[in-house]
Structures are given as structure tokens and as C-alpha cells.
Amino acid sequence: MIFGIGTDVVRIERIAAAYERFGAHFVERLLLPQEREAFDARRRPARFLAMRFAAKEAIVKALGTGFGHGVWIRDVGFLANAWGRPEVLFSPRGRAVADRLGAGHGHVSLTDDAGLVIAVAVMMKKA
């Protein structure tokens, strides 16, 4: 059963400006260590960061917490599986909050066009 649904829209240009201004510090504040490995291999860093930001926002909206209430931006992450599908990761703190709320695993779908990234996330109830 569905626990919650979240969406987010991000302008890639906005994330590009933050990346240009703050550089590695921005990357370290936004990405989990596992995500930084994938980031280092990207040719379009602003697009990658915008997709991660939108996906994280959508997941915390699906949790019903937003950023705060024990879940911060580095408590949620994503790694692409063998087919390129983003798999949701939680830090131990993020997983503890999701468990306390009764949320199980999550799904996210991402797309980008015309300088925008759109993320839709679904959190499932814990079985």
C-alpha cells in the first residue's frame, strides 16, 4: 500500500548557479558518499545535481516530513541500478525516521526537459 506521494520541480539553471558559487562544498552538502562517486563521472554536473535535489525533495514530501523533523538532505540518496533506474537510499538516521513513520521502500521517477527537472516519488507502507 502507498504511504505517500511527493513531487518536485527544479530549474537546472538554479542548481548550476549554486554549484558555480559553492563548488565542492555544495556537492558535499547535497550528496551521500555513494552518490559523489557517480557524480564524479558525469559530464553534465548541474543536471545530475538538479535531478538528485528534485528526487530528494520528492521523497521527503512522500514521507510527509519535508527536510526537517529528523530528515535532512544527506539522509536520502539514490544510486542507479543496472537498468539506470534510481534506487532510494537512506542514511541510518533517514531510515530510522521512515521506520518510525511506518514507511517502507520508495520509488522515484525523474525526467528533464527545457531546463527543468521533474521528480515524482512514492513511498510504500512498511510490510
Set out the residue ranges of the language-model regions:
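Core catalytic alpha/beta fold that binds nucleotide/phospho-ligands
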Residues: 1-127
